[in-house]
């Protein structure tokens, strides 16, 4: 696939993901204002989801069972993603304490880590990383990592947090693009420099990834050019 088409497709996927996140953010805000709107309407864990959206940790513990924690809402959104989208850090922590999996695939194939990497507020990603979440988890549809989600969403702080936690810049998605490649294509100066850190060279899992991989010398050159 030509480079331009691959980039347009990656950006289109990122845009659709951001639209979905924005829609659920609005839904979460409406529910906090007392309107009966939830992606968990009609699900057995609706009361638990409502407690999550309110930040009601006592209600979360009272309602939580393993089956309810695993049950997904509309568009496969997980409760942990719902807590992040509802911007309720106490709910995020309560769900983590109860064993919710940050790496579980949910909304549009993304994990809660992907969702947290796309939001403006970085505290939710910090909470997940503090629990030892798997930072290189793949989107179930695209194969993209949370680091790629942060690059495409333009979240510099999340990018730095993931890199500091050891996120791999060389893991390609199903189109063969790595977070490092995406950062260079989008021409984000700061993020290209962030990606130019010592680390393993891109693997040779596919010939496409191998052909397009950056060398360490190229990484250093990009850093010098963007300083």
Curated annotation (Swiss-Prot):
Alphabetically sorted, this entry's keywords are:
ANK repeat, Repeat, Signal
Q: Which InterPro entries match?
A: Ankyrin_rpt, Ankyrin_rpt-contain_sf
Question: Which segments carry the ANK repeats?
Answer: 75-104, 108-137, 142-171, 175-204
- Stored Gene3D superfamilies: Ankyrin repeat-containing domain (1.25.40.20)
Keyword Signal carried by entry: yes
Q: Per its UniProt entry, which superkingdom is the organism in?
A: Bacteria
Q: Which residues form the signal peptide?
A: 1-35
What is its biological role?
Answer: Cell-protective protein that neutralizes the intracellular lysis capacity of phospholipase A1 through a direct interaction with the enzyme.
Q: What is the protein's name according to its record?
A: Protein PhlB
The gene that this protein is the product of is: phlB
């Amino acid at each position: 696939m030509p480079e331009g088409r691959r980039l347009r497709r990656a950006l289109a996927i990122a845009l659709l993901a951001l639209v979905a996140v924005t829609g659920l953010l609005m839904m979460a805000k409406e529910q906090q204002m007392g309107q009966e709107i939830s992606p968990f309407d009609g699900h057995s864990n609706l009361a638990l989801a409502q407690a999550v959206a309110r930040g009601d940790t006592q209600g979360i513990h009272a309602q939580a069972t393993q089956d309810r924690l695993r049950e997904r809402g509309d568009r496969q959104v997980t409760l942990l993603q719902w807590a992040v989208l509802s911007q309720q850090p106490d709910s995020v922590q309560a769900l983590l304490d109860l064993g919710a999996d940050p790496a579980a695939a949910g909304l549009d194939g993304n994990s809660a880590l992907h969702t947290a990497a796309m939001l403006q507020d970085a505290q939710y990603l910090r909470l997940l990383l503090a629990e030892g979440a798997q930072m290189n988890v793949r989107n179930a549809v695209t194969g993209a990592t949370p680091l790629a989600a942060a690059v495409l969403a333009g979240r510099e702080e999340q990018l730095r947090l993931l890199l500091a936690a050891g996120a791999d810049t060389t893991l390609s998605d199903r189109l063969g693009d790595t977070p490092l490649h995406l950062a260079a294509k989008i021409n984000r100066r700061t993020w290209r420099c962030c990606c130019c850190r010592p680390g393993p060279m891109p693997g040779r899992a596919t010939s496409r990834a191998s052909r397009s991989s950056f060398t360490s010398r190229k990484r250093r050159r990009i850093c010098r050019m963007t300083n």
